[in-house]
């Protein structure tokens, strides 16, 4: 039987695999904010990035290792392909963390060996112990992944795993890279590893899975029943293609059905000991933070954290819930940190009160960013009678999102109506302080604003998504706007909020432009180096 840590470890890969969602690119300050909230959430491991991929990724992993990876905090992990250059960069990046981990991988399925790696099984069996041994010479905690394990020959998989453990791997990760397996198949794969790998008791079995068939969470729960003790997942289930296994769904499934899962961990059925170390009351807060910073809206019917997760429309259901919530609710909303919007602050609230509430919500701002956030708060308080936590989250997210900006919106003014053509006048300031103003017409006020901004910025792009939603109820509610721009096949998101949705649209468009420019500059300054014939964009 695999090494058993006594509970199920939660390995969060939001900052690595989750960030690979189209348009979800995060800057360093955003990654740090999410990592700090993940630490408050209580995850065991944070996979902070892929250090060899770029100077920006290296800096993000190193900064998180310095500021989040404390003695009692989460393990800080970096991803590395099975090459010495990747592994050395990863070791250097996680070095500041008291508890660091190198996560190295190579594909094991025949389709990957033939068409991607162009290597034989014999080649892989030689590479694995060499690279794992090298990683272990640099750090004590080494995780090894068999990419596309779900489509690998089990007998070959057993050989590779045995070799990796013998070389020093302390965690063995089994990825369902393309979300191909079914729960019974995936559970059987984990059971087979436990039965046929002689030294499996020296390592923890981990699983990583994508949601292409909507089975990722079900696969993971079946894996736990068969001996997996680490789950690699993301907040809101974000990730490549259809996403990854959802952290909040996994944690709450084991929380609500603890009596069912206890025996599979060798416990008595009625043991009250939690199956994970996650503080469930932080789940909603973490979900909202990730959604705000990535610009990826959580679907209303998303389990656990969706807007409708605890809503009841049917009269029969409403009647039952009013009499006893257990009639139609298996989770108390307070367990996941969800409470009714409350008036926590008002127009007379001071800077200290705003700062304290923002810290409770997971935002630790610099003095400069707090000053700007407080100014926006006071402006909003003059226009809006009730200020809620969602309002605060909306107005502060831009301070975290835009630490550096090529363009800054100075003002926007629009005129439109049933008998006039929509016209927008905008002023934009560049990084050198130069200010330019231009007017443009469009099919509507937002279209006119975007045309004017494009004229000023002169940055080629295609607008592929515009969405707006109300943060809270009421005619004076803040409107949140998300805009996605595409250039050269890459997506860049911008997110902003204001009581005037046209102003919010202008701010979101400028945010997206700034991300696009920064992304293009990173690509030109730090082109991907590829010392070995491996996939330059790992998905696991």
Curated annotation (Swiss-Prot):
<protein>
    <recommendedName>
        <fullName>2-isopropylmalate synthase</fullName>
        <ecNumber>2.3.3.13</ecNumber>
    </recommendedName>
</protein>
<dbReference type="Pfam" id="PF00682">
    <property type="entry name" value="HMGL-like"/>
</dbReference>
<dbReference type="InterPro" id="IPR050073">
    <property type="entry name" value="2-IPM_HCS-like"/>
</dbReference>
<dbReference type="InterPro" id="IPR054691">
    <property type="entry name" value="LeuA/HCS_post-cat"/>
</dbReference>
<keyword id="KW-0808">Transferase</keyword>
<feature type="binding site">
    <location>
        <position position="244"/>
    </location>
    <ligand>
        <name>Mn(2+)</name>
    </ligand>
</feature>
<feature type="binding site">
    <location>
        <position position="17"/>
    </location>
    <ligand>
        <name>Mn(2+)</name>
    </ligand>
</feature>
<comment type="similarity">
    <text>Belongs to the alpha-IPM synthase/homocitrate synthase family. LeuA type 1 subfamily.</text>
</comment>
<comment type="pathway">
    <text>Amino-acid biosynthesis; L-leucine biosynthesis; L-leucine from 3-methyl-2-oxobutanoate: step 1/4.</text>
</comment>
<dbReference type="InterPro" id="IPR036230">
    <property type="entry name" value="LeuA_allosteric_dom_sf"/>
</dbReference>
<feature type="binding site">
    <location>
        <position position="210"/>
    </location>
    <ligand>
        <name>Mn(2+)</name>
    </ligand>
</feature>
<comment type="subunit">
    <text>Homodimer.</text>
</comment>
<feature type="binding site">
    <location>
        <position position="208"/>
    </location>
    <ligand>
        <name>Mn(2+)</name>
    </ligand>
</feature>
<dbReference type="Pfam" id="PF22617">
    <property type="entry name" value="HCS_D2"/>
</dbReference>
<comment type="function">
    <text>Catalyzes the condensation of the acetyl group of acetyl-CoA with 3-methyl-2-oxobutanoate (2-ketoisovalerate) to form 3-carboxy-3-hydroxy-4-methylpentanoate (2-isopropylmalate).</text>
</comment>
<keyword id="KW-0028">Amino-acid biosynthesis</keyword>
<dbReference type="GO" id="GO:0003852">
    <property type="term" value="F:2-isopropylmalate synthase activity"/>
</dbReference>
<dbReference type="GO" id="GO:0030145">
    <property type="term" value="F:manganese ion binding"/>
</dbReference>
<dbReference type="GO" id="GO:0003985">
    <property type="term" value="F:acetyl-CoA C-acetyltransferase activity"/>
</dbReference>
<keyword id="KW-0432">Leucine biosynthesis</keyword>
<dbReference type="Pfam" id="PF08502">
    <property type="entry name" value="LeuA_dimer"/>
</dbReference>
<dbReference type="GO" id="GO:0005737">
    <property type="term" value="C:cytoplasm"/>
</dbReference>
<keyword id="KW-0100">Branched-chain amino acid biosynthesis</keyword>
<feature type="domain" description="Pyruvate carboxyltransferase">
    <location>
        <begin position="8"/>
        <end position="269"/>
    </location>
</feature>
<dbReference type="GO" id="GO:0009098">
    <property type="term" value="P:L-leucine biosynthetic process"/>
</dbReference>
<feature type="region of interest" description="Regulatory domain">
    <location>
        <begin position="408"/>
        <end position="540"/>
    </location>
</feature>
<keyword id="KW-0963">Cytoplasm</keyword>
<dbReference type="InterPro" id="IPR000891">
    <property type="entry name" value="PYR_CT"/>
</dbReference>
<keyword id="KW-0464">Manganese</keyword>
<dbReference type="InterPro" id="IPR002034">
    <property type="entry name" value="AIPM/Hcit_synth_CS"/>
</dbReference>
<dbReference type="InterPro" id="IPR013709">
    <property type="entry name" value="2-isopropylmalate_synth_dimer"/>
</dbReference>
<keyword id="KW-0479">Metal-binding</keyword>
<dbReference type="InterPro" id="IPR005671">
    <property type="entry name" value="LeuA_bact_synth"/>
</dbReference>
<dbReference type="InterPro" id="IPR013785">
    <property type="entry name" value="Aldolase_TIM"/>
</dbReference>
